[in-house]
């Protein structure tokens, strides 16, 4: 295609940064997550990046059972590439974050290239009321939380997923993460 650059569109359907009080459109239940992923594929997304949420309170979760509730629906409806998170949420340890990828062995998984600070506390002044009791502390306490992704953590994720033949979407949030990607 002369003069045209092919693109690959990825849709991150729910993520782990936002809380249910931030938007009534945040998919939380398995049905909502599946519907949004399928709609994204129908709109042209080649890849859907997926997190799970506790359907009772919208809290980010890496419980494989929650992923099991929406993955079959998506796979049955379309041939979009499934990209499961290994990032989970900033409050989770590496072993917890790995659970869905080890269980479902996706074609693609995200892989953060370094530790970072998610200063979510700055969003507090945008909201006066929260739907769930976990949301305010989740945001408030982010001023003293590190989203850990050390070289050892990254090597562990790569090693743990080697048998799966999972490929990785490399997530770089700053220039140092590019150097880490080059290292691996």
Where would I find each of the regions flagged by the language model?
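N-terminal small/glycine-rich loop or linker at the start of catalytic domains
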Residues: 1-25, 128-134
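Hydrophobic faces of well-ordered beta-strands that scaffold small-molecule active sites
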Residues: 9-13, 48-50, 80-86, 107-111, ...
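Alpha-helix-loop-beta-strand connector modules within alpha/beta enzyme cores
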Residues: 11, 59-84, 157, 161-163
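Active-site mouth loops of central-metabolism enzymes
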Residues: 13-34, 86-94, 143-148
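Glycine-rich, proline-tolerant flexible connector loops at the mouths of alpha/beta enzymes
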Residues: 21, 46-69
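Conserved, mostly hydrophobic/aromatic
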Residues: 33, 40, 51, 109, ...
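Conserved anion-binding
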Residues: 87-91, 99-178, 182-184
């Amino acid at each position: 295609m002369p003069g045209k650059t092919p693109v690959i569109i990825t849709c991150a359907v729910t993520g782990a940064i936002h809380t249910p009080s931030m938007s009534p459109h945040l998919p939380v239940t398995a049905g909502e997550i599946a519907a949004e992923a399928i709609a994204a594929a129908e709109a042209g997304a080649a890849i859907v990046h997926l997190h799970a949420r506790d359907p009772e309170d919208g809290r980010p979760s890496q419980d494989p059972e929650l992923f099991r509730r929406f993955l079959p629906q998506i796979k049955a409806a379309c041939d979009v590439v499934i990209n499961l998170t290994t990032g989970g949420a900033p409050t989770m340890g590496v072993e917890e974050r790995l659970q869905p990828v080890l269980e479902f062995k996706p074609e693609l998984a995200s892989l953060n290239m370094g530790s970072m600070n998610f200063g979510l506390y700055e969003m507090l002044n945008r909201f006066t009321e929260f739907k769930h009791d976990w949301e305010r502390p989740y945001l408030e306490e982010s001023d003293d939380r590190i989203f850990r992704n050390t070289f050892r953590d990254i090597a562990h994720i790569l090693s743990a997923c080697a048998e799966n033949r999972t490929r990785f979407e490399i997530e770089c949030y700053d220039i140092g993460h590019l150097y880490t990607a080059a290292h691996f």
